[in-house]
């Protein structure tokens, strides 16, 4: 049959109902079709890319229609053989019912072509809709022939593969280094009418790099200390740490830590052992106002000391390592107020004093060490006579930094009322009961003996009587 040419503007786009009620029903019942535009081709003996050349309608819509006879896989079976030379058609999804005027007229099955042999076939973009006629639509003359032909719509779906996205990396921040790797790929594959499969891995890695430095790194600390500057006591504004902040992952965590510092009643103390400075009245007054002992909240361990106070409670530790490589030798100046009227002299480096005091404790100290000076040789000489300046050479070897947060331990006690056990002892009453029981037992024993003797006599008499009666019956 020669290809049919349609006038310009005409397209062959029948619906599912039209394909079954008109074309397939007339083909099975042997009725005439006005325009023979659907050829009869054995689809399971041809490859799908050869089918466009067998179509009678030249179409640019990438859609072709064919009548295909049914090829049984087994002679006595009902399964259809859908294997070709280069691959096979595999059914996907469930069979859908096609209705017309609220009446089932047929079924629609979706199949996908795979290259190779099952189960290792490669999926392609060729799709086929197989229409079959319902048994109720067959005429009596064609009864049982509803499976003789199937009307197939063959088309090819275009597989769309999206390009992978570019990898984006965020800029390095002073304390937090964040890098993200985003790559995605999506593919538009064929299954039924529309199938989309995507694979979008998302991997985000965050690296936190703390910064340590000398006294010149105070400016880097301003980014973190600005969150602590608000709602803090003004007497501690001069203290600071030359090093970077703790291991914080974001500014949100920093703000949470700031809130924790603000709600505490006292700030962490600092203990300096083996110091030759005198404990002043000012430090004692601060110790009384704190209302807590020295190592309640924070503990700073210098040199090789790894002991910290009250380790039996739940502590949250923050450890900063890699501090063994850096050692600082600095000259610190301790300015201690003295309210004594007799002490009015100021001593600089190299001075001598007669008073030697040990074990100074400075409470309510915000940072874990004094703020480093920009110039080692710069000395500040106060004009007031109430201050004393003591020059010390302190060698600090930073080993470990431990921050602890203690929680209260609640103990519950249960008071159980005492129980009283009363015991009554009456030996006289017990002896009377024993004597009464013995008398009753003695009476019962004599009566029982008499009763037993009477029973024995009666048994003997009954035995003699039975023997006598037996003898009489034998004689007579």
Swiss-Prot record:
Q: Which residues bind DNA?
A: 105-163
User: Which terms are listed as keywords in the entry?
Assistant: DNA-binding, Nucleus, Transcription, Transcription regulation
Major localization listed first in the record, in broad terms: nucleus
State the tissue distribution: Expressed in a few sieve element cells before enucleation and in phloem-pole pericycle cells.
Observed effect of gene inactivation: No visible phenotype, due to the redundancy with NAC045 (AC A4VCM0). Nac045 and nac086 double mutants exhibit seedling lethality with defective development of the protophloem sieve element.
The record's annotation in InterPro entries points to: NAC-dom, NAC_dom_sf
Q: Which GO terms describe its cellular component?
A: nucleus
Q: Where in the cell is it found?
A: Nucleus
Query: Which regions form coiled coils?
Result: none
Give GO MF terms, alphabetically.
DNA binding; DNA-binding transcription factor activity
Cite the Pfam families for this sequence.
NAM
- Taking every annotated instance into account, which residue ranges of this chain make up the domain NAC? 6-157
| Gene3D superfamilies xrefs | NAC domain (2.170.150.80)
Biological process, per Gene Ontology: sieve element differentiation; sieve element enucleation
Q: What is known of its domains?
A: The NAC domain includes a DNA binding domain and a dimerization domain.
What does the protein in this record do? Transcription factor directing sieve element enucleation and cytosol degradation. Not required for formation of lytic vacuoles. Regulates, with NAC045, the transcription of NEN1, NEN2, NEN3, NEN4, RTM1, RTM2, UBP16, PLDZETA, ABCB10 and At1g26450.
Q: What is this protein called?
A: NAC domain-containing protein 86
């Amino acid at each position: 049959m020669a290809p049919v040419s349609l006038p310009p503007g005409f397209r062959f786009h029948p619906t599912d109902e039209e394909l079954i009620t008109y074309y397939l029903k007339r083909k099975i019942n042997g009725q005439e079709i006005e325009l023979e535009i659907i050829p009869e081709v054995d689809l399971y003996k041809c490859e799908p890319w050869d089918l466009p050349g067998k179509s009678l309608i030249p179409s640019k819509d990438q859609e072709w229609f064919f009548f295909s006879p049914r090829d049984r896989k087994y002679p006595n079976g009902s399964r259809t053989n859908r294997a070709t030379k280069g691959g096979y058609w595999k059914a996907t999804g469930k069979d859908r019912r096609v209705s017309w005027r609220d009446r089932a007229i047929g079924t629609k099955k979706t199949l996908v072509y795979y290259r190779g042999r099952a189960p290792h076939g490669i999926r392609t973009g060729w799709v086929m809709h197989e229409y079959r006629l319902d048994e109720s639509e067959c005429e009596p003359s064609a009864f049982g022939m509803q499976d003789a032909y199937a009307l197939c719509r063959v088309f090819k779906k275009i597989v769309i593969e999206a390009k992978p996205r570019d990898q984006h990396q965020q800029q390095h921040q002073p304390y937090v280094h964040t890098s993200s790797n985003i790559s995605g790929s999506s593919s538009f594959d064929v299954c039924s009418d529309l199938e989309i499969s995507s694979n979008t891995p998302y991997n985000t890695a965050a690296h936190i790099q703390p910064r340590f430095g000398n006294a010149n790194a105070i400016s880097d600390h301003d980014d973190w200390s600005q969150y602590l500057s608000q709602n803090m006591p003004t007497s501690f504004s001069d203290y600071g740490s030359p090093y970077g902040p703790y291991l914080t992952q974001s500014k949100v965590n920093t703000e949470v830590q700031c809130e924790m510092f603000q709600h505490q009643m006292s700030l962490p103390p600092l203990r300096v052992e083996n110091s030759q400075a005198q404990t002043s009245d000012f430090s004692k007054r601060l110790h009384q106002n704190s209302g807590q002992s020295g190592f309640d909240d924070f503990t700073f361990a210098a040199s090789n000391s790894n002991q910290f106070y009250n380790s039996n409670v739940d502590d949250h530790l923050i450890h900063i390592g890699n501090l063994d490589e850096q050692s600082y030798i600095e000259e610190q100046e301790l300015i201690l107020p003295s309210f004594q009227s007799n002490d009015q002299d100021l001593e600089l480096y190299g001075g001598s004093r007669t008073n030697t005091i040990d074990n100074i404790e400075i409470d309510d100290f915000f940072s874990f060490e004094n703020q480093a000076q920009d110039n080692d040789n710069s000395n500040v000489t106060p004009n007031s006579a109430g201050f004393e300046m003591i020059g010390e050479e302190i060698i600090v070897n930073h080993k470990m930094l431990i921050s602890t947060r203690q929680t209260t331990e609640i103990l519950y006690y249960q008071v159980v009322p005492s129980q009283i056990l009363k015991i009554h002892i009456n030996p006289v009453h017990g002896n009377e009961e024993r004597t009464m029981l013995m008398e009753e037992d003695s009476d019962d024993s004599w009566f029982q003996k008499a009763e037993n003797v009477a029973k024995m006599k009666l048994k003997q008499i009954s035995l003699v009587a039975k023997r006598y009666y037996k003898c009489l019956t034998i004689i007579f």
